[in-house]
A protein has these predicted regions:
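A conserved mid-protein helix/loop that constitutes part of the nucleotide-sugar donor-binding site
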Residues: 54, 58, 63-77, 98
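Conserved acidic donor-binding segment of nucleotide-sugar-dependent glycosyltransferases
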Residues: 171-179, 187-193
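Aromatic "clamp/platform" in nucleotide-sugar-dependent glycosyltransferases that forms part
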Residues: 136
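Nucleotide-activated donor-binding/catalytic signature segment of Leloir-type glycosyltransferases, i.e.
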Residues: 97-119
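Short alpha-helical donor nucleotide-sugar binding micro-motif in glycosyltransferases
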Residues: 1, 115-116, 123-128
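Carbohydrate-associated surface elements
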Residues: 13, 32
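Glycosyltransferase donor-sugar binding loop
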Residues: 33, 59, 83-98, 114-115
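Short hydrophobic beta-strand element within catalytic cores of glycosyltransferases
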Residues: 149, 153-156
Length: 239
């Protein structure tokens, strides 16, 4: 980092951190997404009994900083017949996985799918009622971009990394506040019209805001700047 000519960061929060901590100017070039093909619920119905809009989805690594414990605690007190689908691998944190299963054992609406990929992953994103990311800590949450690109209504914690992505196009709760998360989940389950309104604008918003053309353009600009600097150094050294 000390000797880097240029630094690229994925979020404005990290950009501010580098500025305040190291006095370094950085280039903010976020992750991006393409609009995916939506898929009907076939594989997930056969394997898990899931149908369109029948579940709330979390998808990511099962680690403490993702806030999954809050999500399970909050969901257990939500009055709904929808399921909570927690999809993802334990990422070498088997003890945390066991803790989550112990916490969820009395609620048969909570489903742990394990690691998911391919067509089944597409189906989970395509048919969720809402997608939730209750994280305490994030960089640039690619799963959130992906969820919105599928046209999902998203419920996220109010950490800067999530808030700067969704702006006013998603539902937001107070980080680590189980009661507030429960109320937001309940409200979403009770008001499908509001959920639908968020769904209708999610994909267009996120694919326009985070598109690959801009990423390529900005990255090439950084590369061009580096090449120009290198050429000037070579000329001065007469190499």
């Amino acid at each position: 980092m000390k000797y880097a000519d240029e630094i690229i960061v994925l979020s404005k929060g990290v950009q501010e951190y580098f500025k305040e901590t190291y006095g370094r100017k950085t280039h903010f070039i976020p992750n991006s997404v393409n609009r995916p093909q939506l898929r009907e619920a076939n594989l997930i119905t056969d394997k898990f009994g899931l149908k369109k809009d029948s579940y709330i989805l979390f998808l990511g690594r099962l680690v403490p900083e993702k806030g999954i414990r809050y999500l399970v605690e909050a969901f257990k007190n939500v009055k709904t017949d929808k399921k909570l689908v927690i999809a993802g691998g334990s990422s070498d944190t088997d003890s945390f996985m066991e803790e989550l299963k112990e916490l969820a054992k009395d609620d048969d609406r909570i489903l742990f799918t394990g690691f998911i990929q391919g067509t089944m992953l597409d189906e989970l994103y395509s048919n969720a009622y809402i997608y939730t990311l209750p994280s305490d800590l994030e960089g640039m949450p690619l799963s959130l971009l992906e969820a919105m690109s599928y046209g999902n209504c998203c419920l996220v914690s109010d950490i800067p990394e999530c808030a700067e992505v969704v702006e006013d196009k998603a539902l937001i709760f107070k980080k680590a506040d189980v009661q507030d998360l429960q109320e937001k989940l309940q409200d979403a389950c009770d008001h499908p019209d509001e959920v639908d309104a968020h769904k209708k604008q999610a994909a267009d918003f996120i694919c326009k805001k985070y598109n690959w053309n801009e990423v390529v353009k900005e990255t090439m600009l950084v590369s061009w700047t580096l090449n120009k600097m290198s050429s000037e150094v070579i000329k001065k050294l007469k190499i």
